[in-house]
Amino acid sequence: MVREEVAGSTQTLQWKCVESRVDSKRLYYGRFILSPLRKGQADTVGIALRRALLGEIEGTCITRAKFGSVPHEYSTIAGIEESVQEILLNLKEIVLRSNLYGVRDASICVKGPRYITAQDIILPPSVEIVDTAQPIANLTEPIDFCIDLQIKRDRGYQTELRKNYQDGSYPIDAESMPVRNVNYSIFSCGNGNEKHEILFLEIWTNGSLTPKEALYEASRNLIDLFLPFLHAEEEGTSFEENKNRFTPPLFTFQKRLTNLKKNKKGIPLNCIFIDQLELTSRTYNCLKRANIHTLLDLLSKTEEDLLRIDSFRMEDRKHIWDTLEKHLPIDLLKNKLSF
């Protein structure tokens, strides 16, 4: 993030697309401006939009391929230049555009010798290919080559366990992320009480949607996220109505753990989030990447489980232990904590 002093005038809050271009079929660029914002607001909006753009925008991609009787993904098929793994990687790069929901079937069925490109994929009517020239494989001999594909619309990065499938079906680690990158910069304008901020937002997409469409969808997702809070009072929401549902009080981490010591039932461990453990950013990010979100998740892990987490170190383990040992009852540590 860059901060720079520039001249400007106060005006009604508005946004505008100041630059838009198509670098290639799979690379669109857009630059947007939002102003005037009060001091600190540009950061708030910039961070929220960046996260929503990178993590909340849905995309369509190929998630599975079935070759027939192929023993493993490192196999080679007679008459095809690429290995099965290389073909899977090429299929992973195919950019699709659609509004479908759920899983759809597609296929490739060609006869060599010839090059196979994305144009050869037989798709359902609701799906289209962004770049039909994307390569898939090269058939060097006159063979019949068929692949059954599965297509799914999702968000984020989806992975599946690698294993041999007897029917020749292999998962593809799907990148359902149409937004390739997002940058924002903040410029300060004016002097004294007239000082305000201008937010510049840069968005790169893979061509399945434009940066303007991505910005619209991200903004809509953020609005939908906060709508329940706006309607809570109108709908007369009362937590007393949900007597069977546990509602955690707004305590600090220390107060919650003190409650655990005083009350045998205490607060459910799945209602204490690791955000409240006052961990270092590095340790916190390691746990988040391993889908450890609550104290219950953490206490369910062994030392071996934690050390298998990417970039997790013994210092992180000691830091977590010191924090828990300071606040948790000893008997709970013995019963729950495996390290």
Swiss-Prot record:
Annotated GO MF terms: DNA binding; DNA-directed RNA polymerase activity; protein dimerization activity
GO biological process: DNA-templated transcription
Region (Alpha N-terminal domain (alpha-NTD)): 1-233
Subcellular location: Plastid, Chloroplast
Primary enzyme class: transferase
SUPFAM superfamilies: C-terminal domain of RNA polymerase alpha subunit, Insert subdomain of RNA polymerase alpha subunit, RBP11-like subunits of RNA polymerase
Chain's gene name: rpoA
Protein's UniProt keywords contain Chloroplast: yes
The protein's name in its UniProt record: DNA-directed RNA polymerase subunit alpha
Organism: Elymus hystrix
Domain notes: The N-terminal domain is essential for RNAP assembly and basal transcription, whereas the C-terminal domain is involved in interaction with transcriptional regulators and with upstream promoter elements.
InterPro entries, sorted: DNA-dir_RNA_pol_insert (IPR011262), DNA-dir_RNA_pol_RpoA/D/Rpb3 (IPR011263), DNA-dir_RpoA (IPR011773), RBP11-like (IPR036603), RNAP_asu_C (IPR011260), RNApol_insert_sf (IPR036643)
